[in-house]
């Protein structure tokens, strides 16, 4: 409907929360493909992790604390243990890779982590949309690039 009206969507979401599973994450990637939104989603969006401040009640969730490092005042919260995707996206953005290429790398890494075959991506992943030079999201753990800019 919005495409037919010439309106570009730039969806935002927090990919990693205490309730995110690897299967759920892959399902999110599959949905972005189905909706042809790959070119509409900034690569950093694919690795955004919920900011967990000191004293958060979320730390009481069974098994969640094990996914975090101790509180780090420089990061304004508890850094998440799994940094693979964040490092991949940071390297890709530093190289100014197209969104399609970053998504393909995330797609492959995610499927490999789940020990699943990596399905080939379709040619049409959506159209490029107007965008800002630096996406920033509230409630998300800051990226290294954002921390260095202070």
Question: Where would I find each of the regions flagged by the language model?
Answer:
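Radical SAM enzyme core and accessory elements
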Residues: 57-150
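Conserved C-terminal portion of the radical SAM core fold
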Residues: 1-55
């Amino acid at each position: 409907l919005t495409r037919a009206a010439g309106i570009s969507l730039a969806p935002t979401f927090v990919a990693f929360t205490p309730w995110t599973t690897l299967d759920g994450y892959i399902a999110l990637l599959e949905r972005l493909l189905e909706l042809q939104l790959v070119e509409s989603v900034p690569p950093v969006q694919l690795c955004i992790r919920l900011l967990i401040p000191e004293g958060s009640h979320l730390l009481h969730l069974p098994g969640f604390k094990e996914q975090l490092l101790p509180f780090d005042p420089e990061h304004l919260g508890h850094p998440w243990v799994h940094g693979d995707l964040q490092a991949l996206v940071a390297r890709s953005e530093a190289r100014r890779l197209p969104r399609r290429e970053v998504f393909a790398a995330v797609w492959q890494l995610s499927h490999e982590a789940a020990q699943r075959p990596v399905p080939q991506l379709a040619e049409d992943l959506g159209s490029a949309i107007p965008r800002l030079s630096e996406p920033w999201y509230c409630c998300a753990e800051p990226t290294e690039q954002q921390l260095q800019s202070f």
